[in-house]
Amino acid sequence: ITQTLDACHVLIPYREQILRDARQVRKSPALRLLVCLLEQWVRIGGNLNDSSYTPPEGIDFLHLFPAIPTMPETVAYLRQRNVPESVIIATMQEYDASVQMRLLATGKPCFTVDRLNWLQRLIHNRYLHIGRFNFDLPAKHPLGVRVYKSCDGEIALLADDVQIRETDEAFIGRPCVNGLVQEKTVTLPKACWRQRLGPDDRLVNIHIPRAGAFDKQTVLQSFQQAREVFAACYPDEPFEAFRCCSW
């Protein structure tokens, strides 16, 4: 355990608590079996938020142990992709962030089953921390709107949850302004407007960590850095835009 955590640059402040809980698990055949089963469940992408699973009490880092064997695999995969070492270290620090989140919520460091479930995106190599943000790798995500751009650079959003009509001459629908669907209907002539984003486009979903600067320069630098990393390291993962539904 110590060798893996050191090599992956994770959870250094919590080492003693982790080793203490590991000793407890080793003493219990039932807990050892549970950790093995959870590791296999995580590897196949199983849902750990299922209400039929009741986590054992009294072992704060139990749900970290199924993830530890996957950590070197994650680092090796990112290096194979030529992801910058600074991004790899920052990405692996999501384990520390998960413990810190529970520390703020409960008053003690721990790694709960919900955090293991969340980190499946990292375990399955679909997650990066770049600059200020966490980024899921490209996928199709529900937008709720379709995005249109005019020949003058103007952007318009039409709500996708109500009918959008497309004729030979125009796109017709209800505009979405500041997140609110308007009652009026607008017409966007095709001579000047084209659809820029729709339900079949691949997007990069963004998550906003609680700590860190949030000024415009920091945000734009993070987007630019993310574009560079995706272009250089994930040329087989094209995307059309960034999308954020984070808290």
Language-model segments: residues:
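Glycine-rich acyl-CoA binding loop
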Residues: 215-226
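A generic secondary-structure signal
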Residues: 225-233
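Non-catalytic substrate-recognition and accessory regions of acyl/acetyltransferase enzymes
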Residues: 1-217, 232-247
